[in-house]
């Protein structure tokens, strides 16, 4: 086409009053743009949506920022005050990369970069290295003009382009004959009906927006009048009534020239902010993100949660409805962009209502990635935040496997609250109203067929997933991951409600085609996405872990305050349910106590040393530049080991079951760098813990094996402390920690023996005093019985651990836990009675007052001294530290449960993990081979000039299709989740049955043998023999032989005699020919 606009818009007369009175620039002011009312804008939205989108040329990002220069040149041509400013051309969607943007423009009439001052200033913020040292008032100190004649180095460092007019940017009016682009009319952003004072971040009453608002009451309602500041709004004496009813955000171009400026074709342009820029004054208010979006105030309900008794469609209806929607997809012929399938798909209008045509909120971007994550950039894949040229301060990754929508909503809700908190920090040098632009939330699902369907539909309701666009092959190349990008403004609550978020959230959803485990998910995060976004801080979360409202900020602050911090973690708390009802389960209560004491004793101690042995992957943070090099290289070495591509070392395989421990060690001992690890007490996150025995044992097997072998690795490589960049005193301090960890490792190795001996000595001490027996004179028999029961249960656990899955031996493991709890109770009773005997021996049980000589006698008693000191060093210290940390409640609610389940942690879990060091799995099965159920992007043997190879894809093409699919997702999620008991398939049941038969047979065999040994070696049997069977021999002084021994001897002789007789008989028969 010969030009890029059409005169007039549909239904708009060329000589309308507003067109005649609203030029691009006015002679009465130096503020930039004039504006039409909101209603004028709506007249052209239909034309914008109906037109075929056109791409603008993608400029090249210069190596230095020229945005502080503006032209004072007066040679620019004037702009015609005609309705030509309005075009029916659609808002161009975001070009996916540099090549594609160039290809979509006619080479003969290529569009130059936009001359919009809006675009010029979008990247005039301080550089990445110093942006935290500058106040969060964007572009406040820029010169007022950009010199179009300035020369720049055009070497491409990163593709940046000028997406079409976004909020408040207006439409471009291009004249290719002049090789320049004129500034278009800046359209209004607010409507009278929606311009309410919704302050998404709280406390906004103290702020005032920098807009001018004129509706017969200048300055009223907390807004500045036009006289208050140099606004972009000009004061027009001939302005028609109501023309300024809709304000627009103030832009920092305070001294714009009265004549119109153009930018020459060769000059670089900068992308405008996709959500508008606000100029913060001393009393300015945060950007009202959601009130301008058309969705309503933060927290506004878009779809209600399912109600009890609500009628629901059955699964057959939902399946048929989905198939009907999938059949409505249209086959489109589109060009590949740099050989990659990249699509911009409209999202449902229910979640994209807006007063602007911003493609960031109206379209979801999909990429079918066929490359390995290590080659993501090399294969020219891109991400939207990078295309927009945004600096990413924080990248938050949420890894998931098959978690449901409730767990996902819990985690995502916590993340959204944290980002909203960052936006509320208006006095921060880094954060503020636009903080959401510096945070990218990356969700990585481990396997398309393993992912929970309800979680995927929850992402679909947020606009971050559309199953209708996914392809499993692109030109016969299998797809490795499906990448969806969308800046969402809605969230799903745990109750199933769809609500407006406090601020927009940049989401990247990576759905891996195959299940390749968590390490591979982190490789996508670090080596693909972070390598492109270059975040300062990386936050790691597991779906199901819910950070509290300010936790992520607290983690980030530890990096911002201390430049040597390379990693940090917060406190992971057990989710005890509403009213702490989950604590009625002893398993949950014991884990709650274990987590609390670890966060009170272990983590603070290790943080003082500067080396935390493990930063839990469920909630931790790292400085990205600290991870580069050997730490990430060693971290991802475990992926090859678990996939069978690396060495066959069982030691390394178990070591990488706790790969986060390896990462921490490599980070602290990194050569020529002195990074430290910190524990941040104020950062908390809640997580679910196993509440059933099989899941609990399976989880701890991986943890214990990984931590044991990783501890060996850290102790064995202690010398690497001295090759790191740590200061000398820190090296000595870390060496002391290595010695401390070595002692803990030794105690862990002998844990079972130490526990048995402690139990044996306590019972022996309580029954050693003649005439004083805590068991009514049967102390010796009780000690012997329980000693044998202890040994028997160790044998039972050993046999079960050698071959049985916990899921197939639930009864055996549960019985062992109960019996060991009784043994622990008996040991505590014996310890208490021993202390009583010591008090009685010191005369303290019969006196009215304790004297010094009584206390001296008491502490000279070894039984009291040793037991009391050891118990006080443990239990009393727990209580004291809990009180000092102002967190004593777990001592009341969970201490007793943990006390009785201590043998489970020391014996059962340790034995099961040791017996399964050959199992290097994470409890999931890796799927192999590419899938072919989605359909692919097939070649059509045709090319279009400048557009590369064309492919045919079947996709939804309109917002109506997206809305229908969104409604289907909503209907499906409105059906309550049916609690389905876990069932084993036939093969697994047969395998478990065979293993149970083997285990039962071995146990019967071992137990009967042990029973014989126990009976005929017991003290009772020996007394019975001496007093009844051989009483006469005892009186005569003859030696007493155990009758069982005699029976064994005579039986052996008899059996030998039988064999002797048989052998002689055979010879005789052979002699006589038989």
Curated annotation (Swiss-Prot):
Using the UniProt record, name the top-level EC class of this enzyme in a single word. Answer: transferase
Q: Where is this region: Disordered?
A: 1-32, 56-179, 209-255
A GO CC term assigned to this protein in UniProt: cytoplasmic vesicle membrane
Polar residues biased stretches: 19-29, 85-119
The keyword Amino-acid biosynthesis is assigned to this record:
no
Known EC number: 2.4.1.16
UniProt GO BP: cell wall organization; chitin biosynthetic process
- Induction record: Expression is slightly lower in the yeast form than in the mycelium and shows a maximal expression in the log phase at about 14-18 h of incubation. Shows a late increase in transcription at the stationary phase in both yeast and mycelial cells.
Q: Which reaction does it catalyse?
A: [(1->4)-N-acetyl-beta-D-glucosaminyl](n) + UDP-N-acetyl-alpha-D-glucosamine = [(1->4)-N-acetyl-beta-D-glucosaminyl](n+1) + UDP + H(+)
| Record field: transmembrane | 608-628, 742-762, 779-799, 817-837, 867-887, 891-911, 1001-1021, 1048-1068
Q: Which stretches does UniProt call biased (Low complexity)?
A: 68-80, 129-143
Q: Which UniProt keywords apply?
A: Cell membrane, Cell wall biogenesis/degradation, Cytoplasmic vesicle, Glycoprotein, Glycosyltransferase, Membrane, Transferase, Transmembrane, Transmembrane helix
Q: Which residues are glycosylated?
A: 72, 97, 149, 289
Q: Name one GO molecular function term.
A: chitin synthase activity
* Classification via InterPro entries: Chitin_synth, Chitin_synth_fun, Chitin_synth_N, Glyco_trans_2-like, Nucleotide-diphossugar_trans
The lineage's top-level taxon is Eukaryota
Question: Where found in the cell?
Answer: Cell membrane; Cytoplasmic vesicle membrane
The record describes its membrane topology as: Multi-pass membrane protein
The UniProt family comment states: Belongs to the chitin synthase family. Class II subfamily.
Q: What does this protein do?
A: Polymerizes chitin, a structural polymer of the cell wall and septum, by transferring the sugar moiety of UDP-GlcNAc to the non-reducing end of the growing chitin polymer.
- Please identify the protein, giving its name as recorded: Chitin synthase 2
Q: What is the lineage of its organism?
A: Eukaryota, Fungi, Dikarya, Basidiomycota, Ustilaginomycotina
**Which gene holds the coding sequence for this protein?**
CHS2
């Amino acid at each position: 086409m010969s030009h890029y606009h059409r005169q007039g818009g549909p239904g708009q007369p060329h000589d309308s009053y507003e067109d005649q009175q609203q030029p691009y620039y006015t002679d009465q002011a130096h503020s930039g743009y004039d504006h039409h009312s909101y209603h004028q804008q709506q007249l052209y939205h239909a034309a914008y949506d109906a037109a075929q989108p056109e791409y603008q040329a993608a400029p090249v990002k210069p190596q230095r920022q020229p945005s502080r220069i503006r032209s004072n040149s007066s040679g620019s041509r004037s702009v015609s005050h005609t309705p030509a400013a309005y075009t029916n051309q659609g808002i161009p969607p975001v070009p996916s990369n540099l090549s594609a943007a160039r290809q979509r423009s006619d080479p003969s009439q290529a569009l130059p970069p936009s001359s919009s001052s809006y675009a010029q200033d979008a990247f005039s913020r301080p550089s990445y290295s110093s942006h935290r040292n500058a106040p969060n008032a964007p572009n406040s100190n820029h010169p007022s003009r950009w010199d179009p004649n300035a020369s720049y180095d055009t070497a491409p460092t990163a593709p940046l382009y000028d997406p079409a007019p976004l909020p408040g940017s207006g439409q471009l009016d291009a004249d290719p004959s002049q090789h320049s682009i004129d500034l278009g009319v800046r359209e209004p952003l607010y409507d009278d009906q929606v311009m309410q004072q919704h302050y998404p971040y709280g406390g906004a009453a103290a702020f005032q927006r920098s807009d001018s608002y004129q509706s017969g009451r200048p300055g009223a309602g907390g807004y500045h009048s036009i006289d208050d500041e140099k606004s972009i709004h000009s004061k027009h004496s001939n302005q028609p009534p109501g023309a300024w009813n809709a304000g627009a955000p103030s832009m920092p171009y305070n001294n714009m020239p009265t004549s119109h400026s153009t930018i020459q074709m060769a000059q670089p342009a900068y992308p405008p902010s996709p959500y508008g820029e606000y100029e913060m004054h001393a009393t300015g208010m945060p950007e009202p993100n959601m009130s301008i979006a058309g969705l309503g105030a933060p927290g506004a309900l878009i779809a209600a949660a399912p109600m009890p008794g609500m009628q629901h469609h059955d699964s057959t209806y939902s399946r048929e409805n989905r198939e009907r929607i999938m059949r409505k997809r249209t086959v489109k012929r589109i060009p590949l962009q740099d050989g990659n399938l990249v699509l911009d798909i409209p999202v449902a209008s229910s979640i994209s209502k807006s007063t602007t045509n911003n493609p960031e909120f109206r379209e979801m971007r999909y990429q079918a990635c066929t490359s390995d994550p290590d080659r993501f950039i090399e294969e020219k894949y891109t991400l939207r935040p990078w295309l927009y040229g945004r600096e990413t301060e924080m990248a938050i990754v949420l890894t998931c496997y098959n978690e449901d929508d409730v767990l996902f909503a819990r985690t995502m809700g916590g993340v959204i609250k944290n980002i909203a908190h960052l936006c509320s920090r208006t006095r921060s040098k880094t954060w503020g109203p636009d903080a959401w632009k510096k945070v990218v939330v990356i969700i990585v699902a481990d396997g398309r067929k393993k992912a929970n369907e309800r979680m995927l539909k929850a992402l679909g309701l947020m606009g971050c997933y559309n199953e209708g666009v996914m392809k499993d092959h692109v030109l016969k190349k299998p797809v490795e991951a499906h990448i969806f990008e969308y800046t969402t403004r809605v969230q799903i609550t745990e109750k199933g409600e769809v609500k407006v978020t406090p601020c927009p959230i940049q989401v990247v959803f990576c759905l891996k085609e195959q299940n390749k485990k968590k390490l591979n998910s982190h490789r996508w995060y670090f080596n693909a996405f972070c390598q492109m976004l270059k975040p300062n801080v990386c936050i790691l979360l597991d779906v199901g872990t819910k950070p509290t409202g300010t936790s992520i900020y607290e983690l980030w602050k530890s990096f911002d305050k201390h430049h040597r911090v390379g990693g940090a973690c917060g406190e992971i708390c057990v989710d005890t349910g509403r009213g702490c009802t989950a604590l009625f389960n002893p398993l949950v209560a014991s884990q709650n106590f274990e987590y609390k004491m670890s966060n009170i004793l272990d983590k603070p101690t290790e943080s003082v040393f500067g080396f935390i042995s493990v930063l839990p992957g469920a909630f931790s943070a790292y400085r990205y530049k600290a991870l580069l090099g050997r730490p990430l290289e060693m971290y991802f070495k475990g992926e090859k080991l678990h996939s069978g591509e690396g060495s066959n070392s069982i030691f390394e395989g178990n070591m990488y079951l706790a790969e986060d421990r390896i990462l921490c060690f490599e980070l602290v001992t990194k050569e020529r760098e002195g990074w430290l690890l910190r524990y941040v007490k104020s950062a908390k996150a809640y997580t679910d813990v196993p509440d059933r025995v099989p899941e609990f044992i399976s989880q701890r097997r991986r943890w214990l094996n990984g931590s044991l072998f990783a501890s060996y690795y850290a102790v064995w490589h202690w010398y690497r402390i001295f090759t790191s960049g740590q200061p000398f005193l820190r090296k000595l301090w870390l060496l002391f920690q290595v010695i401390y960890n070595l002692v803990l490792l030794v105690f862990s190795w002998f844990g079972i023996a130490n526990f048995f001996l402690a139990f044996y000595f306590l019972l022996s001490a309580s029954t050693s005093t003649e005439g004083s027996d805590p068991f009514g004179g049967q102390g010796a028999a009780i000690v012997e019985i329980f000693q044998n029961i202890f040994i028997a249960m160790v044998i039972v656990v050993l046999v079960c651990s050698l071959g049985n899955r916990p899921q197939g031996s639930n009864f055996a493991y549960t019985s062992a836990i109960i019996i060991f709890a009784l043994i622990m109770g008996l040991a505590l009773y014996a310890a208490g009675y021993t202390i009583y005997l010591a008090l009685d021996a010191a005369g303290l049980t019969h006196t009215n007052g304790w004297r010094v000589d009584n206390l001296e006698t008491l502490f000279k008693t070894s039984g009291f001294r040793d037991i009391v000191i050891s118990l006080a060093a443990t239990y009393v210290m727990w209580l004291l530290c809990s009180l000092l940390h102002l967190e004593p409640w777990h001592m009341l609610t969970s201490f007793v449960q943990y006390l009785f389940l201590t043998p489970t942690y020391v014996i059962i879990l340790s034995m099961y993990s040791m017996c399964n060091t050959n199992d290097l799995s994470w409890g999931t099965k890796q799927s192999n081979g590419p899938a072919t159920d989605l359909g692919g992007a097939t070649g059509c043997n045709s090319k279009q000039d400048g557009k590369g190879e064309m492919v045919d894809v079947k996709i939804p093409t309109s917002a109506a299709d997206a809305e229908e699919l969104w409604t289907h997702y909503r209907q499906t999620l409105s059906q309550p989740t049916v609690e389905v008991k876990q069932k084993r398939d036939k093969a697994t049941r047969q395998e478990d049955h065979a293993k149970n038969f083997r285990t039962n047979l071995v146990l019967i065999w071992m137990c009967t043998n042990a029973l014989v040994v126990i009976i005929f070696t017991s003290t009772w049997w020996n007394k019975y023999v001496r007093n009844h069977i051989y009483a006469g021999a005892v009186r005569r002084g003859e030696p007493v032989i155990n009758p069982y021994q005699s029976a064994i001897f005579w039986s052996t002789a008899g059996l030998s005699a039988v064999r002797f007789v048989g052998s002689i008989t055979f010879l005789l028969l052979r002699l006589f020919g038989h």
